[in-house]
Amino acid sequence: MAKGSANNVKVNQDAGKSQPEKKENKDFQYIVRIANKDLNGERLLPLALSDLKGIGERLGYVIAERLDLPIDKKIGELKEEQLEKLREYVEAKEYDLPEWLLNHRREPVTGKNLNLVSTDLEIQVQEDINLMKKIRSYKGIRHEKGKKVRGQRTRSNGRKGLSIGVVRKKE
């Protein structure tokens, strides 16, 4: 057959059909505000919660289960009562969760296990670093000098500043 014959032409069979219409939910919120952060209402609940600093996907699933919220629903589809319950739970610092799931265990001052979110987490991490600097611990000294803190090698990686290149020996 020739290249231009009718048998090789692709025909769009769906051209006359209309696209299935999406149901418009009047209560749907495209932006949900939790812990001073706007979350995308079109994401699933646990994944939307993971956009908050201090909450990961696993903790998002656990929070949804604890509050009996559907994990297969988008966060924008939740009712206002459910969202209020979610806000209260997320913004609380102490949780009834296993210690290994929290992000600030055995806090130095109170000894409590906390899960901090958003700016609270950022402030607490900075305070912890300042405490390490103040007591002159090894990690604090490394932070002061701007060096790597967690045992990484520093000979070849993590160099700052401009590269000079290879310097030749003068003849």
UniProtKB/Swiss-Prot annotation:
GO molecular function list: rRNA binding; structural constituent of ribosome
Listed name of the protein: Small ribosomal subunit protein uS13
Subunit structure, interactors included: Part of the 30S ribosomal subunit. Forms a loose heterodimer with protein S19. Forms two bridges to the 50S subunit in the 70S ribosome.
Protein's gene: rps13
Protein keywords: Ribonucleoprotein, Ribosomal protein, RNA-binding, rRNA-binding
Biological role: Located at the top of the head of the 30S subunit, it contacts several helices of the 16S rRNA. In the 70S ribosome it contacts the 23S rRNA (bridge B1a) and protein L5 of the 50S subunit (bridge B1b), connecting the 2 subunits; these bridges are implicated in subunit movement.
HAMAP family (alphabetical): Ribosomal_uS13
Family named by the database record: Belongs to the universal ribosomal protein uS13 family.
Keyword Nucleus among record annotations: no
Comp. bias (Basic residues): 144-158
GO cellular component, one term: cytosol
